[in-house]
Amino acid sequence: MRVMEMRKNCQHLWKWGTMLLGMLMICSAAEDLWVTVYYGVPVWKEATTTLFCASEAKAYKTEVHNVWAKHACVPTDPNPQEVLLENVTENFNMWKNNMVEQMHEDIISLWDQSLKPCVKLTPLCVTLNCTDANLNGTNVTSSSGGTMMENGEIKNCSFQVTTSRRDKTQKKYALFYKLDVVPIEKGNISPKNNTSNNTSYGNYTLIHCNSSVITQACPKVSFEPIPIHYCTPAGFAILKCNDKKFNGTGPCKNVSTVQCTHGIRPVVSTQLLLNGSLAEEEVVIRSENFTDNVKTIIVQLNASVQINCTRPNNNTRKSITKGPGRVIYATGQIIGDIRKAHCNLSRAQWNNTLKQVVTKLREQFDNKTIVFTSSSGGDPEIVLHSFNCGGEFFYCNTTQLFNSTWNSTEGSNNTGGNDTITLPCRIKQIVNMWQEVGKAMYAPPISGQIKCISNITGLLLTRDGGEDTTNTTEIFRLGGGNMRDNWRSELYKYKVVRIEPLGVAPTRAKRRVVQREKRAVGTIGAMFLGFLGAAGSTMGAGSITLTVQARHLLSGIVQQQNNLLRAIEAQQHLLQLTVWGIKQLQARVLAVERYLRDQQLLGIWGCSGKLICTTTVPWNASWSNKSLNMIWNNMTWMQWEREIDNYTGIIYNLLEESQNQQEKNEQELLELDKWANLWNWFDITQWLWYIRIFIMIVGGLVGLKIVFAVLSIVNRVRQGYSPLSFQTHLPAPRGPDRPEGIEGEGGERDRDRSGGAVNGFLTLIWDDLWTLCSFSYHRLRDLLLIVVRIVELLGRRGWEALKYWWNLLQYWSQELKNSAVSLLNTTAIAVAEGTDRIIEVAQRILRAFLHIPRRIRQGLERALL
């Protein structure tokens, strides 16, 4: 019984042991994943970088110094590439776009730089004795459009100017527009001179003299806006949204990538956007927040409205010298037509445009009544439509454009027709600089008539606010003044991204490297020592931080380049570099920095020159537990990058540590390289070394043989023995019953042999070598026989063990099978018995129901009886 109990316990132990072994085999069969580095993956991240310009500046009046291009932009690409990104959805935000800020700063720098060498008007900030210019004597043409210039619109002023001799002044005369001078004190001329007209006189000064530094634009400066393409340096790209109804914010499903934007004309204007891009389908309105009346509404039209502006009168320009090389240009006289400057546009086109704008505004503001009205007041640049036309700055009244009410059906006071709308304009020569406070520019008069044709492509609207939520009317006015909105109307569909070509993902492939145990070394502290922190360490300790030093070295190079760029930017007025020149230099240096950084990381990870690089870093499921099929077949690189974005720093550090350990292992392996591969022993380059060793061994053996022979002879001589010859036969002693032999060479000879002593040195060497080889052969043969015997025993034992395990596996398989069959039989019997019981109960219940009528009949019979 005791034996049977022990046998049962052993059987249970074998059963559980087999189950554990199977579980271990299943767990060990699970495949391991390893980090693989990929270079050139299509991944990007939002970034801000230095953009540079491309333009065909030489095609626009090469003899004129253009403010915008300055001939420093690179030529445009004749075949620009635009790559459509399929199945890509990207978020855009035109109101938080660094490209707008960068363009704004660039235009400011260009204005400042173009005016830097020009003449300051400080000597003209004196008292001007002005009267109304007499315009009655001019010839008036009968051309249509425009109104007569009002009396007093132009002032004839006299002032004192210092000549080339500083102690001598000279009186000069010049014509100034009424908007450019402000009165100091004003009165009427004395009655004795009041015989011809009611001309007023007074003391004036130039506007902005007390608050700004006025600079005269250089004579050959041209303000004609030419298309400027903003481009990204290498390593960056521009994403472009091609959705035709894109409102400026939110996701865009039709995305492409370009290297440069389209040609953007930096038109400085208010209220109306001129010569911009058009919407492809319907009118589009954009605002950062439509419910906030402070936010400007940018309207992009789908069809342009042509506006023709002109200054009819023919002005002459006179020069006033105030010193050597310093000349001030002013209006000498007005010849010919004395009508006001004005702009004409088609009423039908404008009304059709307003109708489409109203439709979009109603969609946004719940079908309310839309009222367009004039500006509520402010600076002339805001109240009037200001822009540059042929070098003169026009300020036009747009009340006729925005003076209508649109109810739910049609505009109430919107007059139709095909007539022309004429906007009266005034000209200012002293313009308050829009980009900075405290600066103003004097635009010298342009001689001759001025005409310019522009296209209205957009509007800048502001909405009146109010707390009355029940109001059914929304009032809109033309606005502007913030030039960022002008640039934003063109850059709304672009965003700059930084290309991240390095990607990591799990694969089944593992780098084949030297396998050694990782030793615990104190590298954590050294990682934070910095670039020069390991200078006082030993060479062994310093080699651990080589990657840290390489990284800090590159950071030092980048820092030096940034310092150089800042120095150049600070001294660009001495180096004569334009803002575009600075940006091109920054862009090119930035591209080199990006490339060096990527190559540095690849080198640190041991992946230089590889597009796909396997590593020995195991993939951690905590980074992403998705399967390989899910990752490689269902996710894009952008989605995968977002998945592991929080762990890329950890992965990079592990890759660096793994490569450091691998390099250390390889260094230790090189020290044992001669013993690493037995096949190298047969390398022909080692034969001379082998021959030399062989000669040394043979020489040593022969020398030992000679030494021992001499010592033996000396020992025998000392014992009184004198050898007759080296060939003397020394037979072994025999017994009396073993004769030496019989005649005829019969009989048995002794086994002992006495070989004759060899003659000569070479014969002696050969004899020793033969003895050595024979000894080595016999020993190797014995060793081989022992090894064969051991292998045979191991094989027999192994085969017996395999047969034992196989029989055990068969036994337990049969036991499991029998147990399963027994369990199934028991279950089947229990189910069958239960089913029989259920069927029997159901039959009894059914019989009871069937016997109810019989029981009723029997009861009635008993009752009747």
Swiss-Prot record:
Gene Ontology cellular component list: host cell endosome membrane; host cell plasma membrane; membrane; viral envelope; virion membrane
Further comment found in the protein's record: Inhibitors targeting HIV-1 viral envelope proteins are used as antiretroviral drugs. Attachment of virions to the cell surface via non-specific interactions and CD4 binding can be blocked by inhibitors that include cyanovirin-N, cyclotriazadisulfonamide analogs, PRO 2000, TNX 355 and PRO 542. In addition, BMS 806 can block CD4-induced conformational changes. Env interactions with the coreceptor molecules can be targeted by CCR5 antagonists including SCH-D, maraviroc (UK 427857) and aplaviroc (GW 873140), and the CXCR4 antagonist AMD 070.
Domain notes: Some of the most genetically diverse regions of the viral genome are present in Env. They are called variable regions 1 through 5 (V1 through V5). Coreceptor usage of gp120 is determined mainly by the primary structure of the third variable region (V3) in the outer domain of gp120. The sequence of V3 determines which coreceptor, CCR5 and/or CXCR4 (corresponding to R5/macrophage, X4/T cell and R5X4/T cell and macrophage tropism), is used to trigger the fusion potential of the Env complex, and hence which cells the virus can infect. Binding to CCR5 involves a region adjacent in addition to V3. The membrane proximal external region (MPER) present in gp41 is a tryptophan-rich region recognized by the antibodies 2F5, Z13, and 4E10. MPER seems to play a role in fusion.
Region (Immunosuppression): 583-601
Record topology, Extracellular segments: 32-693
Residues annotated as site: Cleavage: 519-520
Reported modifications of this chain: Highly glycosylated by host. The high number of glycan on the protein is reffered to as 'glycan shield' because it contributes to hide protein sequence from adaptive immune system. Palmitoylation of the transmembrane protein and of Env polyprotein (prior to its proteolytic cleavage) is essential for their association with host cell membrane lipid rafts. Palmitoylation is therefore required for envelope trafficking to classical lipid rafts, but not for viral replication.
Any single biological process term in GO: positive regulation of plasma membrane raft polarization
Membrane-spanning segments: 694-714
Region (V1): 130-156
Motif placement: YXXL motif: 721-724
Residue window of motif Di-leucine internalization motif: 864-865
Glycosylation sites: 87, 129, 136, 139, 156, 193-194, 197-198, 203, 210, 247, 254, 275, 289, 302, 308, 314, 344, 351, 367, 397, 403, 407, 413, 418, 455, 471, 620, 625, 634, 646
Covalent lipidation (S-palmitoyl cysteine), chain numbering: 773
Composition bias type Basic and acidic residues, residue spans: 735-754
InterPro entries according to UniProt: Gp120_core_sf, Gp160, GP41-like, HIV1_Gp120
This protein's UniProt keywords: AIDS, Apoptosis, Clathrin-mediated endocytosis of virus by host, Cleavage on pair of basic residues, Coiled coil, Disulfide bond, Fusion of virus membrane with host endosomal membrane, Fusion of virus membrane with host membrane, Glycoprotein, Host cell membrane, Host endosome, Host membrane, Host-virus interaction, Lipoprotein, Membrane, Palmitate, Signal, Transmembrane, Transmembrane helix, Viral attachment to host cell, Viral envelope protein, Viral immunoevasion, Viral penetration into host cytoplasm, Virion, Virus endocytosis by host, Virus entry into host cell
Region (Disordered): 728-754
Region (V3): 309-342
GO molecular function: structural molecule activity
Encoding gene (name): env
Disulfide bonds: 53-73, 118-218, 125-209, 130-157, 231-260, 241-252, 309-343, 389-452, 396-425, 607-613
Similarity remark: Belongs to the HIV-1 env protein family.
Residues covered by region (V4): 396-425
Name used for this protein in its record: Envelope glycoprotein gp160
